[in-house]
Amino acid sequence: MSKHSEYWDTRRDKEIRQTLSELRALADAGYFEGLQPQPAVPEDLKLQSLVAAQLSKGAVFARKVQVLKPMDNPVGPALTQFMTQLLVRDRTEPYKQETLKKFEDAVGQVRILFGKIVRGEIASNAIIRSIVASFLDTFMKDRNLLLNLAAFPQTGPDYLYDHSVKMCLFSLSLASAAGYSRSQSIEIAQGALLADVGMMLIPERIRLKRGKLNEGELFEMRKHPILGLSLLEHVHGLSEAVLVIPYQHHERISGSGYPDSRSGQAVSRFSRIVSIADVFTALTNQRSYRESLVPYQAMLSLLSMGGSGHLDGEHIRQFLRTMSIFPLGSLVRLASGKVAKVVSPNASEFTKPVVSVLTNESGAPLGRFDIVQVDLAASDEKIVEALPHHSITHGVLDGF
């Protein structure tokens, strides 16, 4: 066993112990009661040799990852050193509407962007950088509001573009929590935004199929990392650190991912970050073949995947502390019977976030000016139930 493998195994064992300890504490508090079964990790399905031969560029690129690997450690001043956080009372209605419009516009821009990439009409990464930069400016001063928008379930059959924007935002949050610099965080966010562009080459009858995919369809779907890389290699200005993300974002540090079944340190840290964002986004949004999970359940699923070694436990713990076990934007029921929305995490006590109370004890909605914020770490009030988004009628900006 190499020194790198020994280090990784030791670190993973430590993360598993810490994660299990936290899960036991949550169980003692009664948070696991009534949970749905956790989604199973898909079985590995390797690309057949014929496809691998046809797309040999992807295999060559994969071997280059080992050379690039040292470049994915945090370098330079951490982005968090320059970040602030607006309080609920400091947000104006025009500002909130402008931020929501920026998010919605980005989804439309990604739709256009992906189409142009497929047609070979994108010569440089300027448009990609501009989308990420517009989010970064807001993220630097109001991360909580952006992550609330990302946490709101998508509606409509074609999830690809919405999913890409949300994955970008969650990856940006993970990158900052991991101590990456501004330039590195931008690279991670760019890679996340482009991670699923290869899905554009998957037939819609498969990509949008209602119901579970059969083995042949799953085989076709799992081509998209290599297809995405082949599309993006023609876009000038994308660094190899960015390009590795679309190629590796379905690899798992346990070796159970695809397209190359790479494991441990062979999976770049950038890709591990985006993998977590990808899984969380997928679990919290409805698909044609399943309902979405309550964000709380999705976070528990991530913890389970981190504990089993499928996903990076270190980054999941950082995500937990920046989102809370009841993630930003979640609806929860308090012991008083009131329904509230999570509006800010509590890094030291991740079961006790700051919430905005949206209803009274009987469930009747409160007026806009009657909504109050409660820091559960400094209150006798506590969360007794995580609720799906459709539990009450509310808007994405309510409580913020």
Regions found by a protein language model. Give the residues of each.
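Non-catalytic interface/linker regions that flank or bridge core catalytic/transmembrane domains
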Residues: M1-L160, T359, D370-F400
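All-alpha helical catalytic cores of prenyl diphosphate-utilizing isoprenoid enzymes
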Residues: L136-M140, P157-K166, V197-M200, E240
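Short, conserved phosphate-binding/catalytic loop or strand-edge motifs used
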Residues: L145-F152, I188, L194, M200-L208
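Alpha-helical phosphate/pyrophosphate-handling elements in metalloenzyme active cores
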Residues: G108-Q109, P157-I188, L227, G264-A266
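Alpha-helical scaffolding flanking metal-ion-dependent phosphate/phosphodiester catalytic sites
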Residues: M167, E187-L201, F219-I316, I325-P327, ...
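Post-HEXXH active-site segment of zinc metalloproteases
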Residues: I206-N214, L293
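Amphipathic, well-packed alpha-helical segments that form the structural scaffold of globular domains
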Residues: R111, A133-M140, A151, C168-L172, ...
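Metal-dependent nucleotide-binding catalytic modules
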Residues: K3, W8-D9, T284-Q286, E314-F400
